[in-house]
Amino acid sequence: MSSVNVDFEQAGELKIGQVGIANLRIRTLDVPRLVREMQDRVTRAPKLFGRAAVILDFGGLAQAPDLATAKALLDGLRSAGVLPVALAYGTSEIDLLSQQLGIPLLAKFRAQYETAAVSPPPPPPPPPARAEPAAPVARPAPGRMQRNAVRSGQQLYAENCDLTVLSTVGAGAEVIADGSIHIYGTLRGRALAGAQGNPDARIFCRDFHAELVAIAGHYKVLDDVPMDLRGKAVQVWLEQDQIKIAALD
């Protein structure tokens, strides 16, 4: 079984959100380096990143940037070909910075990075009580099935469930699921599984020519996929925050 494990992320970790908005998690305030990396992304995948909306996330830094550095970064990213539209991670410093820059503050992507807070010790158990009838167990949401082709410009979203496509996902089309995605035709567009941050979601496809695949925000574009996997039946999964792709044959 052949697989690929290539990490192109360097100074900034780019994640793709549920509706195609990219989240740039800043790891260093080396503005020229960040701009060069973004220029490289746009050059390698212009249809994906050219004039793409980007949210800047400074939450991974020990200290928020000063206003001059933040302005330089926004200007540099615009020159690289993307459109910074908001700041993520709502600390008071970032809140003030967003006001000074005149752009919104969003917290949509925070859960993908933050570790869960340490829970307090559980309280002592209550005294035994008379048994009550068990509440009915909620059934998981049924998977969504798409029988017809998903054409260029269309977006299909399966909320809180898996998505099965029995036909083709055309170039420029986008299929998104909070669970896994199964495509029984050709995938030429984009497939984003685990859209709400589920790292165990997978993508299965019979004929792989995807513009982009993403799981829990981590992504890989077609140019980064070895030629021997293109046109094959493959599965895509996430391992240690890196996308892996392997043939099913």
From Swiss-Prot:
Stretch list, region Disordered? 116-149
Annotated GO biological processes are: cell morphogenesis; division septum assembly; regulation of cell division; regulation of cell septum assembly
Q: Where is the composition biased (Pro residues)?
A: 119-130
- Cell division: present as a keyword of the record? yes
Q: Name one Pfam family in it.
A: MinC_N
Q: Which UniProt keywords apply?
A: Cell cycle, Cell division, Septation
Biased composition annotated in UniProt, kind: Low complexity: 131-142
Task: Name the residues that span the membrane.
Answer: none
**Family according to the record:** Belongs to the MinC family.
Task of the protein:
Cell division inhibitor that blocks the formation of polar Z ring septums. Rapidly oscillates between the poles of the cell to destabilize FtsZ filaments that have formed before they mature into polar Z rings. Prevents FtsZ polymerization.
Q: How does it assemble?
A: Interacts with MinD and FtsZ.
According to UniProt, the name of this protein is: Probable septum site-determining protein MinC
> What is the name of the gene encoding this protein?
minC
